[in-house]
């Protein structure tokens, strides 16, 4: 197949061997190569070709054009070289703050935004110092990066003062969130059940002859002696609530834990945790 074609010495094109002699004779006599585009042009039309094609091209190359990176006006003939140097400069991405060259900055921004909108599975999310979360115990808003240390202090065992002779337990206000309308530094509560003797003694009143009312006084030791031995032993045993960690006697611990867990669950539903 290569023998069927030959290269013309004038126009440098492949010509069929069957017509090669005729083509080369005609080409050497009437065809010349354009010095600008090196295209074979008839000699009689070379002047017109230079004026129409190459003169307009030269004039357009002198026109100013804006660089797509710095928007400066540069001659069109020098625009490619200018944009090559200008696009190699770097700027920080506004989303990830990484230095990116101007040539690929627009594509990087699109990828960066899509990556932020769809975080990868299994990727560890680092809590930022500005974000806050709510403590389940004290219900205070605390920074996420201090949540672990806060929980160690917030869930520490509470100090309980028990006065045996008057049957009073003084408990710090870790359950303040259970009663939003009544927040106090400490909660004092008589956890002893009321007995028939105690209720009847408080209801009976004896009027003296001078019109004054005399209320019978009963000491804490006397009230404690009225309780059954089994109940008294149960009230001497204190355990922590599994939710709020306060110490309570066994007879009221179960009821308290149910209420405490129910309120904590309602709080989580309310805040969308």
Curated annotation (Swiss-Prot):
Domain of life of the source: Eukaryota
Pfam families registered for this protein in UniProt: TRAFD1-XIAF1_ZnF, XAF1_C, Znf_XAF1_N
Zinc finger (TRAF-type): 22-80
Chain spans, region Disordered: 181-228
Cell location: Cytoplasm; Nucleus; Mitochondrion
Gene3D superfamilies (UniProt xref): 6.10.250.1730, Zinc/RING finger domain, C3HC4 (zinc finger) (3.30.40.10)
Chief site of localization: cytoplasm
BP-aspect Gene Ontology terms: apoptotic process
Entry protein name: XIAP-associated factor 1
Organism: Mus musculus
Name of the encoding gene: Xaf1
């Amino acid at each position: 197949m290569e023998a069927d074609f030959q290269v013309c010495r004038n126009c440098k094109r492949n010509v069929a061997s069957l017509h090669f002699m005729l083509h080369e004779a005609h080409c050497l006599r009437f065809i010349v190569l354009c010095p600008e585009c090196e295209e074979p042009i008839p000699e009689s039309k070379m002047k017109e070709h230079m004026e129409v094609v190459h003169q307009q091209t030269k004039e357009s190359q002198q026109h100013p054009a804006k660089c797509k990176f710095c928007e400066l006006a540069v001659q069109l003939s020098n625009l490619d070289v200018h944009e090559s140097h200008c696009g190699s400069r770097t700027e920080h991405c506004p989303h990830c703050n990484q230095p990116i060259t101007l040539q690929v900055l627009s594509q990087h921004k699109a990828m960066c935004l899509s990556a932020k909108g769809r975080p990868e599975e299994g990727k560890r999310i680092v809590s930022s110092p500005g974000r806050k979360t709510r403590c389940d115990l004290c219900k205070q808003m605390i920074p996420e990066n201090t949540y672990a240390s806060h929980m160690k202090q917030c869930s520490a065992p509470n100090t309980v003062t028990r006065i045996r002779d008057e049957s009073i337990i003084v408990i710090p206000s870790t359950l303040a969130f259970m009663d939003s309308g009544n927040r106090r530094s400490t909660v004092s509560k008589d956890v002893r059940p009321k007995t028939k003797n105690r209720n009847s003694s408080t209801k009976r009143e004896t009027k003296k002859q001078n019109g004054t009312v005399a209320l019978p006084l009963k000491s804490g030791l006397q009230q404690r002696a009225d309780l059954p031995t089994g109940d008294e032993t149960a009230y001497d045993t204190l355990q922590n609530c599994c939710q709020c960690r306060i110490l309570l006697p066994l007879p009221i611990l179960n009821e308290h834990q149910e209420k405490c867990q129910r309120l904590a669950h309602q709080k989580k539903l309310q805040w969308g945790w």
